[in-house]
Amino acid sequence: SSGLEDGDNANMSTVYDMALLSSYAINNSLYKKIVGTKDITVKTDLKTYVWHNKNRLLSSYKYCVGGKTGFTERARRTLVTNASKDGVNLTVVTFNDGNDFGDHKDLYEKYFDSLKEYEIVSEGYIDSKYDDSYIDKSFKMSLSKDEFKRIRKEISYYENSASKVVGRVSVSLDGKEYFSEDIYIKDRVKKEEVNLSFWQRLIKRLKELW
């Protein structure tokens, strides 16, 4: 499919579709370099060619890191841009907007002022019922103060797990899960067992088996 709206093989995308795609793509270093390039010069034996990126925000807004302009008959002027400030990464998409560059800048300024990056889960050791429990990944979110208050972090444990994976930690906001990761342990000793003698731990294990 071509991405255009007309013809037998037409397809359509929403601004939300474009925002998801661009937010994912900007994490690719090559893509980010391409869409973030303001100008490029190519010299041949006969002539020198200079191309200028049509995304004017790259030059007029210092936090813009990439994006793509476009035009179709139905959507008219389309613009997808990405911006980053103080760890907060945002994507703005507009269709049929005659003031798209100005609107994008205004939206960035509005949400950069209201959002902050929070580290919800830190990589490494976590507080749980097992000693030496840890996770392999950290998780950060850009949130308003009110959203941060509504974040829910939950830890669940697997019953009688014989592996080093003893549970999961999950993060949700307003009922939607945004992060889930396994909890590992280096030594299968629960915190309450640390001060038990060898025989006390053995008896406890036998009782669990019975």
Where are these regions (language model features)?
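Surface-exposed aromatic
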Residues: 1-7
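Domain-terminus/edge residues, biased toward the C-terminal soluble/receptor-binding domains
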Residues: 9-210
